[in-house]
Amino acid sequence: MEHTYQYSWIIPFIPLPVPILLGVGLLLFPTATKNLRRMWTFLSIFLLSIVMIFSLYLSIQQIFLSCIHQNVWSWTINNEFSFEFGYFIDPLTSIMLILITTVGILVLIYSDNYMSHDQGYLRFFAYMGFFNTSMLGLVTSSNLIQVYFFWELVGMCSYLLIGFWFTRPIAANACQKAFVTNRVGDFGLLLGILGLYWITGSFEFQDLFEIFNNLILTNRVNLLFFTLCAFLLFVGPIAKSAQFPLHVWLPDAMEGPTPISALIHAATMVAAGIFLVARLLPIFIVIPSIMYIISLIGIITVLLGATLALAQKDIKRGLAYSTMSQLGYMMLALGMGSYRAALFHLITHAYSKALLFLGSGSIIHSMEAIVGYSPDKSQNMILMGGLTKHVPITKTAFLVGTLSLCGIPPLACFWSKDEILNDSFLFSPIFAIIACSTAGLTAFYMFRIYLLTFEGHLNTYFLNYSGKKSSSFYSISLWGKEEEKNLNKNFGLVPLLITNNTKRASVFCKKTYKISNNVRNQTFITVENFGLNTRTFYYPQESDNTILFPMLLLLLFTLFVGAIGIPFNQEGIDFDILSKLFMPSINLLHKNAQNFVDWYEFFRNATFSVSIALFGIFIAYCLYKPFYSSLLNLTVLNSFQTWSSKRIRWEKLINFVYNWSYNRGYIDAFFKTSLTESIIRLAKQTNFFDKRIIDGITNGVGITSFFVGEVTKYIGGSRISSYLFLYLSYVLIFLTILFFFYFEKF
């Protein structure tokens, strides 16, 4: 076993040859490199698979032996300072290695098909390989300097991948926003690292924890300065894991390709912040105020992310805010001192969210053949609906991921989220109420996404008249339509517009689908000329096997990965893998608890959390399912609005929630007004001062000298004798004045 640990240093470097060789190949041999692009994909998957096998072996050793292995090499710069670098293998490292490699391999397989049409196919895989290398290096680092180095590489790779389609201004702005926002967190992290080194004189984790705890116990250091350094360390994870208030970059990061959205939200960038807080928890845990700040930031993020996801129309942005909320749960658990629950939820959420993002990518891939390659159309849930019969495998996978995130047993996220909710009651009743309420909101917005996407009828070809010109629930616009005056608005529901032609709408569509009987029995309206080119309506088709295969594997993970943390412990005997892996574990909430589980208490708590989730699902079904039912007359529904003043208050509440979510809680607007515009004004004033004042003084001196020289040249007439006469005259005048003032003193 010791022999295996000695070669652990190679883990981050195994995937590195692919991006290096791709970069060299594209520069020197572009044609040959592009012709062999499938070979590079296979090599990327193969090398990451080697890392996965190595990581599995290390994890098995950690389960049975629960040991920590560290190997450090020293690089002496001078007699007073030496830099040490190495690798650090413990249970946290082994879990992160498995998470990164398993999700990374599946995303690479998925990307082979998803990005096959893109001209930047090889560039994408080069970035992905470098991204995986950076994250593997981060989790195996043995000191804070290495952590910061790989931390910055992770940020750089995310910048490159978010702005992968850099010719699109929205994507270019999104990657800049992510980069600048994370610079704020990274600067705080750097200050915290330097402050910690100034106190302890070490960057190594084990030395750092020991020295830090000794200084706190012996009260030999300023506690306020310690707290400041610890908070600055926490600022980095706030930005990287999209915690309030540095979360604003996360929804814009959806401008990147969908596979990288899955990787960022599941196993790499946002997981890096949770990993660092978990790694530094022995430092945070001795400062109660910092632990409370961590939990407070976490609970605010939990609620904020859930409320911002309530009315999103873009399917990827809805999932992005869901990620933000779930990361808040993990941060809340770490702030409460529930180390095991936080990492358990990190694992279960990673596989569930990767499944949801890959499922959304499959949906987008199918919709692009119908509505085109504009994200405003292909990712808009308002234009979807009725996809169950068109993409049944994707629908099943997406439903499993949705149920898991809602906390429905026996799926993965149920076990971890239930543990966090139970621990929150032990920590703070107020935090517990917010966490439980947000669990209901999670179920609501996730099933809202599911219902808008898969239930009802395909809304791309539908024009819905409800008696109102605008509504956040059922206003569906038809792309390219002319004025609506051509239609009879007495219809309560116009479910289908039929035009006559046999031309194919897209080269990707191979067949049409028959209309179901329940639609066939409804009122139809035929429009011979609606201002559009006549064409036949085509429907999305299921994605290729290369896209479906990773989704099915992630579905299996979502079904069974929760088993590693199911509390089967009885009479002090630990049967679950997670307990063995984290023994001894940090848990401030169960210091005096028994080693076995009270099943009655477990089922009681589980029943409560599942009831909240089912209530959220029921509300979502009531609000969204009817609007996509072919039996509902929306004009009749709208007539109920005049019956009661409560209906008006309900509409106001809906509009408030919609505006809050659509405007991102007005936080982006606040930053734009208070920071961005202020910085722009300051930059303009600085530019004015530099150009007008600083440059004005310099240019003024130069111009003055020029004119003095010109005047002198004009008076002297360009003759040396004249210059000598003027020079002697000035000297004589100066001496006369000096002589006069000198004798006046006497």
Swiss-Prot record:
Keyword Transport assigned: yes
Pfam families in the cross-refs: Proton_antipo_C (PF01010), Proton_antipo_M (PF00361), Proton_antipo_N (PF00662)
Transmembrane stretches, start-end: 9-29, 40-60, 89-109, 125-145, 147-167, 185-205, 221-241, 258-278, 280-300, 327-347, 354-374, 396-416, 425-445, 547-567, 608-628, 723-743
Protein origin, superkingdom: Eukaryota
E.C. number: 7.1.1.-
Listed GO MF terms: NADH dehydrogenase (ubiquinone) activity; quinone binding
UniProt subcellular location: Plastid, Chloroplast thylakoid membrane
Cellular component GO terms, alphabetical: chloroplast thylakoid membrane
Keywords: Chloroplast, Membrane, NAD, NADP, Plastid, Plastoquinone, Quinone, Thylakoid, Translocase, Transmembrane, Transmembrane helix, Transport
InterPro entries: NADH_UbQ_OxRdtase_chlpt_su5_C (IPR002128), NADHpl_OxRdtase_5_subgr (IPR018393), ND/Mrp_TM (IPR001750), NU5C-like (IPR003945), Proton_antipo_N (IPR001516)
Catalysed reactions, as listed in the record: a plastoquinone + NADH + (n+1) H(+)(in) = a plastoquinol + NAD(+) + n H(+)(out); a plastoquinone + NADPH + (n+1) H(+)(in) = a plastoquinol + NADP(+) + n H(+)(out)
Membrane topology reported for the UniProt record: Multi-pass membrane protein
GO terms of biological process kind: ATP synthesis coupled electron transport; electron transport coupled proton transport
Family: Belongs to the complex I subunit 5 family.
Known role: NDH shuttles electrons from NAD(P)H:plastoquinone, via FMN and iron-sulfur (Fe-S) centers, to quinones in the photosynthetic chain and possibly in a chloroplast respiratory chain. The immediate electron acceptor for the enzyme in this species is believed to be plastoquinone. Couples the redox reaction to proton translocation, and thus conserves the redox energy in a proton gradient.
Subunit organization: NDH is composed of at least 16 different subunits, 5 of which are encoded in the nucleus.
NCBIfam families per record: NDH_I_L (TIGR01974), PRK06590.1 (NF005141)
Protein name per the record: NAD(P)H-quinone oxidoreductase subunit 5, chloroplastic
Lineage, uppermost ranks: Eukaryota, Viridiplantae, Streptophyta, Embryophyta, Tracheophyta
